[in-house]
Amino acid sequence: MADHSEVDSVSGTATTGHAWDGIKELNTPLPRWWVITFYITIVWAIGYWIVYPAWPTITSNTKGLFGYSSRADVAVELANLEKIRGDKMAALATASLADIEKDPQMLALARAKGKTVFGDNCAACHGTGAAGAKGFPNLNDDDWLWGGSLEQIQQTLLYGVRSGHPKTREGQMLAFGKDGTLKPAEIITVANYVRSLSGLPTRQGYDAAAGAKIFAENCVACHGDNAKGNPEVGAPNLTDKIWLYGSDEATLIETITNGRAGVMPAWEGRLDPTTIKAMAVYVHSLGGGK
């Protein structure tokens, strides 16, 4: 490798003095426009550091000479938005559920607000489309454990189910096997009887009369003589082919043996009353509201 520079005979540009396998490196200067632009960006960066928030400090950050804050801009925009919505939200806060249903504009506002709140607070369990999952009800159908009227939905949202709230909805599926109320063979029989109520196939040799007898003695108090359930205690309809935990025999045996006691949180105290009202309207509008 050479230790001195020379001028390239073709380009007239000096070399760096380096050569690799006969290939020499030209010392071509940067274009003047590029150098000027580079220096301008340095000056611009220094100016930006001075006039805008830029450098973090131990407790905050430098504020800059302009005192600009994008968060402050957002706060102003949100305040303006709240001002625009203020009258409508105030009307929504004082309106009854029946009044909201009668007013198309108020109904649209409640649905829009309720949809947003649902996505933030309810979708984790019920799904973004409110179709539910195992143990979490589908809110699009017309099957309601605790009633599907606007008032009933609002009450469920306010106080929850087995949530610990003083006004929570109480009621649970008893553990007939775990408590020793029914024997394993009886549980299998009544599980098949429950399947038959929805037209599902039953185990070969299943005794329908015995299943009906066990059901009448142990289940009618909550689910009713016709097995159509009771929203007063959260007992589901067993004849509509809608299943919260599953309709297969093994799942029904598990349910009857160990019971079910799902929990829904109470939203009173977490969300303001107007927001809960809007969420009730939204859930009611999903298609299954009564």
Swiss-Prot record:
Annotated localization: Cell inner membrane
TM spans (from-to): 33-53
The protein's required cofactors: heme c
Main location: membrane
PANTHER family: CBB3-TYPE CYTOCHROME C OXIDASE SUBUNIT FIXP
Role this protein plays: C-type cytochrome. Part of the cbb3-type cytochrome c oxidase complex. FixP subunit is required for transferring electrons from donor cytochrome c via its heme groups to FixO subunit. From there, electrons are shuttled to the catalytic binuclear center of FixN subunit where oxygen reduction takes place. The complex also functions as a proton pump.
Protein name listed in UniProt: Cbb3-type cytochrome c oxidase subunit FixP
Species of the source: Bradyrhizobium sp. (strain ORS 278)
